[in-house]
């Protein structure tokens, strides 16, 4: 890199001071030469002073003579070489400005000669003015912006951090649920009858009067076909604010999935997890749902695919059919438990029911009629009834004294026929209430 040489006047001043200092430190007290005396005789002039043109011409010969004596100027009178101290100073300044991080480490200053070290400690007004002006010239150059270079580096790193995507790891239930549902159902379903569309844009058959339907319908909507861009490559956690609210979680079920993956996703979902349905039933229901969906898909496409490429309505239909199956099963089992308990109480009550004691038929005279009764006959009837009641009372007292509590039935059991009849009744009532054409089956 080429550094512009300083003006000749300033150079004469600095070198003049330098030679004066050497002369003072010379133990032999050597007399200065004529050039040095002429340089010292020139008054100190600042670099920023406005010099006339003739002054520059007067100082020029002195400058040439001094340079020729010191051996620092070439034979060409129109070219002035830069003193080594200024080159070192400029080099150090450039290193400091281009390498701001070097401030944490000790800067290695090039001090090859004691001469350079002495020059660095010059504190005369002339040298200070020159250094000030010289450094000001650097402030206007491209190297006078060390903060800019540092800012560019830090800004670049911050841009890298900003461009690094930060994916969402937690979402609220409202954000996790879909906002629209028009793509989940075929146009025929949505446009057939506007009266069959709910306020949220879903068909009426998505609202069922079943046990915990709304809760599990929300869970079914958390089964998604693809990841959102803000989620990255991982499903976020669904956060709920309520203490007593159940936990929700997202599940991924792509549109192009194998039958086994669809079945496993449905069985391992949280749909009606509170009902504690056995895994065999859920597995059977999922297999039946997927098999029915595959049959309809092959009828529509006319081809058999190892992996079904489902449309969004077909995909949603599989989830809702499985949800309906497990919901009906949970409702029937809940109703069965209720009716079974009611039937057991009724059966227990009838088992412990004590029937009133009636007089034996032989004690009542044959052909006895009330309107034929005389006073004596009425008295005889009263006497017979009184004796019978007294006898029964004594027998009851003896029985209670002997501990008739052993004969009281505290627990009853139902036969398989009774259980099958109750289950059949529960299924029939649920199917009729929902408008399903399903046929009741045996106890599963």
Curated annotation (Swiss-Prot):
A molecular function (GO) term: protein kinase activator activity
* Other remarks on this protein: The prion state [GAR+] is provoked by the interaction of the two proteins STD1 and PMA1. It involves a complex between a small fraction of the cellular complement of PMA1, and STD1, a much lower-abundance protein, and it is transmissible by non-Mendelian, cytoplasmic inheritance. [GAR+] makes cells resistant to the glucose-associated repression of alternative carbon sources. In contrast to other prion forms, [GAR+] cannot be cured by GdnHCl or by inactivation of the molecular chaperone HSP104. Present with 238 molecules/cell in log phase SD medium.
Membrane association type: Peripheral membrane protein
Complex formation: Interacts with SNF1 kinase; via catalytic domain. Interacts with the glucose sensors SNF3 and RGT2.
Q: Where is this region: Disordered?
A: 1-77
Q: Would you identify the family this protein belongs to, as annotated?
A: To yeast MTH1.
Pfam families linked to this entry: STD1 (PF17235)
Q: Where is the composition biased (Polar residues)?
A: 28-64
Q: Which domain of life is it from?
A: Eukaryota
Q: Where is the composition biased (Low complexity)?
A: 65-77
Q: Which organism is it from?
A: Saccharomyces cerevisiae (strain ATCC 204508 / S288c)
Query: Where does this protein chiefly localize?
Result: membrane
Cell location: Cell membrane; Nucleus
Q: Keywords in UniProt for this one?
A: Activator, Amyloid, Cell membrane, Membrane, Nucleus, Prion, Transcription, Transcription regulation
- The gene for this chain is STD1
Cite the InterPro entries for this sequence: Std1/Mth1
| GO BP of this protein | glucose metabolic process; nicotinamide riboside biosynthetic process; nicotinic acid riboside biosynthetic process; regulation of transcription by RNA polymerase II; response to salt stress; signal transduction
> Which Gene Ontology terms of cellular component type are present?
nucleus; plasma membrane
Name the UniProt record assigns to this protein? Protein STD1
Describe its function. Involved in modulation of glucose-regulated gene expression. Together with MTH1, represses the hexose transporter (HXT) genes in conditions of low glucose. Stimulates the SNF1 kinase by an interaction with the catalytic domain that antagonizes autoinhibition and promotes an active conformation of the kinase.
């Amino acid at each position: 890199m080429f550094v512009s040489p300083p003006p000749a006047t300033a150079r004469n001043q600095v070198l003049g001071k330098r030679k004066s200092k050497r002369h003072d430190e010379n133990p032999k007290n050597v007399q200065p030469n004529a050039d040095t005396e002429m340089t010292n005789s020139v008054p100190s002039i600042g670099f920023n002073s406005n010099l006339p043109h003739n002054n520059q011409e007067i100082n020029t010969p002195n400058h040439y003579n001094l340079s020729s004596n010191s051996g620092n100027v070439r034979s060409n009178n129109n070219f002035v070489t830069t003193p080594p101290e200024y080159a070192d100073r400029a080099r150090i300044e450039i290193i400091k400005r281009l390498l701001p991080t070097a401030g944490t480490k000790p800067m290695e200053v090039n001090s090859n000669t004691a001469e350079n070290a002495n020059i660095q400690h010059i504190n005369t007004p002339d040298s200070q003015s020159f250094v000030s002006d010289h450094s000001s010239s650097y402030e206007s150059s491209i190297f006078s912006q060390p903060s800019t270079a540092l800012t560019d580096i830090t800004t670049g790193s911050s841009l890298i951090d900003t461009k690094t995507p930060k994916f969402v790891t937690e979402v609220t239930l409202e954000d996790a649920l879909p906002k629209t549902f028009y793509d989940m159902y075929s146009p025929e379903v949505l446009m057939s009858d506007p009266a069959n569309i709910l306020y949220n844009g879903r068909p009426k058959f998505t609202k069922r009067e079943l046990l915990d339907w709304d809760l599990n319908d929300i869970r079914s909507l958390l089964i998604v076909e693809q990841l959102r861009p803000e989620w990255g490559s991982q499903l976020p956690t669904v956060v709920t604010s309520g203490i007593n609210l159940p936990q929700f979680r997202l599940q991924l079920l792509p549109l192009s999935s194998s039958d086994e993956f669809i079945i496993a996703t449905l069985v391992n979902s949280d749909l009606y997890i509170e009902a504690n349905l056995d895994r065999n039933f859920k597995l059977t229901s999922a297999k039946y749902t997927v098999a029915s969906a595959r049959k309809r898909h092959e009828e529509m496409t006319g081809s058999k695919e190892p992996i079904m490429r489902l449309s969004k309505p077909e995909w949603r239909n599989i989830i809702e059919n499985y949800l309906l199956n497990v919901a009906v099963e949970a409702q029937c089992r809940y109703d069965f438990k209720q009716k079974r308990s009611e039937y057991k109480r009724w059966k227990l009550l009838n088992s412990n029911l004590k029937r009133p004691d009636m007089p034996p038929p032989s004690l009542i005279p044959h052909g006895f009629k009330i309107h034929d009764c005389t006073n004596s006959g009425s008295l005889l009837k009263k006497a017979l009834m009184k004796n019978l009641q007294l006898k029964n009372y004594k027998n009851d007292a003896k029985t209670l004294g002997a501990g008739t509590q052993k004969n009281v039935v505290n627990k009853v059991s139902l036969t398989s026929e009774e259980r099958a009849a109750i289950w059949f009744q529960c299924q029939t009532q649920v199917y009729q209430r929902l408008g399903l054409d399903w046929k009741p089956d045996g106890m599963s």
